[in-house]
Curated annotation (Swiss-Prot):
Phenotype upon loss of function: Fewer progeny and embryonic lethality. Fewer stress granules containing gtbp-1 form in embryos exposed to heat shock. Weak, abnormally early expression of adult-specific cuticle collagen col-19 in hypodermal cells in 17% of late larval stage 4 worms but does not induce early alae formation at L4 molt. Suppress heterochronic phenotypes in a lin-4 mutant background. RNAi-mediated knockdown leads to fewer progeny and 50% lethality. Reduction of gtbp-1 levels in the germline.
Low complexity bias locations: 241-255, 474-510
Basic and acidic residues bias spans: 79-92, 125-141
Protein name: Prion-like (glutamine/asparagine-rich) domain bearing protein pqn-59
The keyword Cytoplasm belongs to this UniProt entry's keyword annotation: yes
SUPFAM superfamilies xrefs: UBA-like
Keyword terms, alphabetized: Cytoplasm, Phosphoprotein
Biased composition (Polar residues): 431-458, 597-612, 683-696
Naturally occurring in which organism (per UniProt): Caenorhabditis elegans
CDD domains in alphabetical order: UBA_UBP2_like (cd14277)
Chain positions covered by the region annotation Disordered: 79-172, 198-217, 228-265, 410-517, 594-624, 659-712
Domain of life (superkingdom): Eukaryota
Amino acid sequence: MGIKGDKKATSDQARLARLTLEGNSGNEEDIQFMIKTIIETTGCTQAQAEIALLDTDNNLYGAIDHILDAGDKLDSWTEQKGAKKEKKKPEEGSYNNRGFVARGRGGGTGFVDRGGRGRSNGAPRESRDNNRDNRDNKEGAAPRSTRGGFEKPYVGRGGRGGARGGYSRAVAPSSALEPDAFTADLDENQTKVDTTVTEVQPPVEESVTATVPTSSAPAPISFAAVAAAAHRKEALRKHQAQNPQPAAPPRRSLSPQPPLPSVAPVKEEPAAAPVFFEPETSHQPEKEDGFFQNESSVLAEEQTPNVSTHHDENVQSTPEPNQAWTTQLKTDLGIGLSEAPGLGLSPIPSAAPVQIIPDPGVEFVGTTAPTNIHDYSFGFVEAAPSPQLPSTESSAASISNASENIFNSSRIMPKQVEPERTSIPNGDYNLKSTSPPLSYGQSNRGLSYDTSSASYQPTDRMAPNKFNNSGPLPTQQSAQQHQPQQQQQQAPQQPVQQQQQTPPAQSQPTGHPQQHPHMMFTQQLPYAPYMNNYMNMYNPMPGVRDEQYTAALMQYGMGVDLTSLLPTAPLSQAASAQQVQSGQQRETHGLMDFNKFGSQSSRDQQPQQASNVGPPPGFQATNYMQQPNLSSLFMQQYSPAPHQFTPFMNMMPNVGSSAGGRQLYGQDDERKSYDKMSGSKPAAQQNQHSQYQHNGGNLGKYGMNKPYNWSN
């Protein structure tokens, strides 16, 4: 209710107001009579009559006068709506008249052919061409070439993305599909330019001034087009530099148009773009020829129109900042300067210093304009020209070298910084197997072992499993506190275990006991590939809370004794040291003593586990790890190769608890033979039965009646 233009709503309001007014309820018939009278008198609608009566407080004559005075404006709401609708029509017409079709920003109301964001869908070609021709004829300029090159509206003007993406999809097809229309435009263009320029032709400077006003607003140059044209232009520029035109006095271009000798001096253009030999026409037809016939002059078209033609009185101010930025950027990057002698790479009016090029067609603004010397100097310098860019090749080479230095230095910089990054004591985040050893020593300061003493570098794979990874943490201090204890404990154990370990590589000199607390962790690393990630999850550093877990794990880690698996002695010593530290009084050299094992292990192990800290979650060491320890320990000594690839298989419950599981790996018979050798087979068998029954009946004697009770 009460919305503008809603007649029914206003009439309802009028009725409600009329009903609520005092004394009106009894005058309904009078009001209806007055409404009829107003309608008959003025020919208005009933709603208008009611509103007029309401506005005039039920004054019949006042309401009639109000309606007659208002006339057409009586319903101001609907009248405004009509005005809005009528406004849209002239707007559409004005868009079309202005040639908005080729300059639209997206698909607006009147821009049928500007499809979407910068992808000019070339559907209504005819309307586009007609609009362009009409616009160009109105402007009195050469059609198509005035917008910064051939059919610039397609190239740089397409939607929001057209200017950045280089040529839109319609460029090449339009030039290829419409050669007749294009040549017709060329002929018109040539005749127009000839008429405008021929009188002034001998002094080329005037030809420039004659053609300058023909330009319309400058179109931005797409870097893709510039880069594409750079290679093609380079050959032409070198060719032109080798064959210099006699009538080209070098001029430093300070006038708004940069000297473009390949384009501005009309007589030299055939050499640059030899496809069309039309020496008498001014630059624009030739630019089109170059673009249409030989794409080598794309730069010329894109830049000369932007530069030379864009500077009429209205537009001069706008292109200069944009093109100055473009030129400076290109000069820094050395994009187009390979074609230096022929073309000022930047479309800027030669305010940019590097753009000084021998230019026969533009007069020098300063007082001292050298006439016979080909030199390059900064614009607005009225002293003798400073040979900033001595020659084409040298300038191009120097720019390329500079660009190479820039890019190479940017590439080299991260390399120089990387060692510093990896050396941050950030532990595992920067550990790489390829980084220098220095970074290891520094990044692993928190790991209380000396990585430089290790026989190999820690691999990336182990890195995420390390815990002490940043700075000298308390673990390092505690590790250092425990080092003397470890050394004392390992000193007697080393000779025993080195005798026990059969591989010769395991002989670690006893003169270096201080390395073993360090080696204890590094030697453990290679076993992560064996899918036993628990080894690294439990921190073997002494003085840390979970050292007893680690001791139990190191001894019984995978159902086999790790001391028999590890390739070098220090790790086995570390394991034994861990056991002694964690309160297990079991003698490590007794592992190889068969007689001791049968009698001692079952007796010692049960009470120890009862009094010890419990094994890590998922490991019930006492119930299924003893017998596999015995058999696999002996097997490892004689055939270590096969079990290094499947050391974790003995962790499976059926392996530890059933003879069938053992027979899968060929261990049962050998275990029995080992038991016979030790002379303690009855004890071992008794231990086996009691072990399984000790589990509360979860496992039968030899069969898996139930799943293993991991929480027991």
